């Protein structure tokens, strides 16, 4: 007995099917009303079956076979179409797990001309065919064929063909593709009819122009079972929504002084054991200064809190709530009553002590040890360093100018000597003596030496 996807048995379908003239049970769908409307608007021409991408003319490689399921269209370039083992077979009523085997066929769609005259190729669309049907009906499961991706369920016997009848488009509409829970749809692809299908939106607009009765009937028949697989488009949709609102999803939110103050106050309003320190509310504001009883945290980690890049690996060592209560020594201690503002309030402390044991086989062991050694009792090093380093003296305005002025005042400046004094105090060099002897031999006394002869 051959199986028909979407049909469990003829007896269980009374109100949702119409009997055609040839005795074939035909399902009345929203597509029947939109594509083959009852108003007979084709002016006497024969009703044509709804064309799919596999039968459209001038659409690349024409496939003369109808798939039982709607296609999966690629919308991002460079993405690979593949499924994990045991996944990828569309589910349909009436098809047992043993027959869930087949292949996805790549249909190369047509190209179109852009306004600037360039040819642009549409990204391909994939259609599913059961093993032994479709354009590669004679191929065996796993054959290396370009544009074919083989899929099968874990219970299917891939050595035999699937006992599935070919789809007659005049009797059966294509079933919206949906997968078993847990199936991961390839990234960069979407299921036709899952919300991004242009033909669906155009058909919906046509149905709205046919009066209120047809609109109501069309909307009721339009309810198709949605695919259980959600394409990886959450980031894209969020970015589009934010762009519509005038916000940029790629830019981080700017933190102002007012917002930082609000974040800090919100953290401090929580109970002490529920606080999470960060850049806006550092560790010491949440839990107090470091000391013998709170001895963890270096300068960088105290400033960043849980925003420190090293903190996540330390969080792996933190106990769970159950480990805290059942793996620690707990003691309930009553402290002094509340302060003057609330003297009737009783204050208790749940004191605890325990240990976290790990060894060198723990992933990231060396990094954990390094971070622990840097942050345990780090307050001691910080305190010691503060005592050793002397504070930087503050510069007083005008000190340097006054010092320079004092140095100038302390310098004694001698009065310049006359030309006679300079000549008397100066010793004659051998060159001077030879020149002077030559002058005296000539009998010419130079000006300025007449009076100096007596000196």
Curated annotation (Swiss-Prot):
Pfam families: CoV_nucleocap (PF00937). One of its GO terms (molecular function) is RNA binding. Residues 64-193 form the CoV N NTD domain. The modification Phosphoserine is found at residues 170, 194, 390, 425. Residues 267-384 are annotated as: Dimerization. Residues 260-383 form the CoV N CTD domain. Keywords: ADP-ribosylation, Host Golgi apparatus, Phosphoprotein, Ribonucleoprotein, RNA-binding, Transcription, Transcription regulation, Viral nucleoprotein, Virion. Residues 393-403 have a biased composition (Basic residues). The keyword RNA-binding applies. It is found in: Virion; Host endoplasmic reticulum-Golgi intermediate compartment; Host Golgi apparatus. Residues 56-197 are annotated as: RNA-binding. One of its GO terms (cellular component) is host cell endoplasmic reticulum-Golgi intermediate compartment. ADP-ribosylated. The ADP-ribosylation is retained in the virion during infection. Its main location: virion. Residues 9-19, 50-61, 215-227 have a biased composition (Polar residues). The keyword Transcription applies. SUPFAM superfamilies: Coronavirus RNA-binding domain (SSF110304), Nucleocapsid protein dimerization domain (SSF103068). RNA binds at residues 109, 125, 167. It comes from the Viruses. Residues 1-62, 159-230, 271-292, 384-428 are annotated as: Disordered. Belongs to the betacoronavirus nucleocapsid protein family. Packages the positive strand viral genome RNA into a helical ribonucleocapsid (RNP) and plays a fundamental role during virion assembly through its interactions with the viral genome and membrane protein M. Plays an important role in enhancing the efficiency of subgenomic viral RNA transcription as well as viral replication. Homooligomer. Both monomeric and oligomeric forms interact with RNA. Interacts with protein M. Interacts with NSP3; this interaction serves to tether the genome to the newly translated replicase-transcriptase complex at a very early stage of infection. This is Nucleoprotein. The gene is N.
